Amino acid sequence: LWSNSQAVYVHRGAVTDVSIAQEFAAQPLFFLRFLLKSVASSVIGVAQIQELEAGSPWFVRLHLVYLLGLAVFVSYLLALYLNVRFQLYKKTIFPLLLVLSGGCNHLLVLAARWIFLKDEYGMSSRYEIQYQMGIVGILLTFALVWSRCREKAQETEADKAKTRVPEKRAARTLLKVCMLAFTVLTVFGNAWTTRAEIRTAPYRKAYLQVS
């Protein structure tokens, strides 16, 4: 830590030398855009997002990446809530640690790369492995909660409890829809991105060999 504190860092391409607090006070929306874009890139690659934007109406084109980022951000919050609500950490703390690790990685990338003042910097593919820990944690949380909901539904059927069953059933259905939607988005987005990367890999290898 002492050695690191004595180091002199040279950020090539940095466009500001003010502190992060000063920059946040000057343009707070930049940090929000940075986070939303980096969070969105954890389920769908940058090239795929750009492809979706290119074929969308102007309103969707302007806001698609932010809507995706917001959806993933809400899923992070939902996973944290479900870990506490169902006390999943008593059975296994692993999903919660993954969720926290993924979220902290987004904040670390922001803290390290805001100085370039490019809100798409956090979408770089080199950060994807760091982000995927959070996505895996969310999916594991959803899987555990889905299993817990099935167990409770079976208990309700067995006991034939009538009190507040419709409300609980509606809440469980809504929760399942949200979890299923995020799972489909994640699987589809990662499959699409991986397929494109596999197709691009030979050309990237040839380019690196020449250069």
Locate each region found by the language model:
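Transmembrane alpha-helix segments characteristic
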Residues: L1, F86-I115
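Signature aromatic-anchored transmembrane alpha helix within multi-pass, membrane-resident enzymes
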Residues: L1, P95, W146-A191
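Membrane-lumen/periplasm interface segments of multi-pass, membrane-embedded glycan/lipid transferases
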Residues: W2-L82, L117, S125, Q132
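Lipid-exposed faces of alpha-helical membrane segments in multi-pass integral membrane proteins
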Residues: A71, L97-L108, L139-F142, A181-F188
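Transmembrane alpha-helices and membrane-interface helical segments
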Residues: Y76-A79, Q132-K152
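Membrane-interface helix-boundary motifs at transmembrane edges
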Residues: L82-T92, V165-A170
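Flexible internal linker/loop segments at domain or repeat junctions
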Residues: S101-R126, L139, R148, K152
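Membrane-embedded, lumen/periplasm-facing catalytic core of multi-pass transferases
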Residues: F116-I129, A171-S211
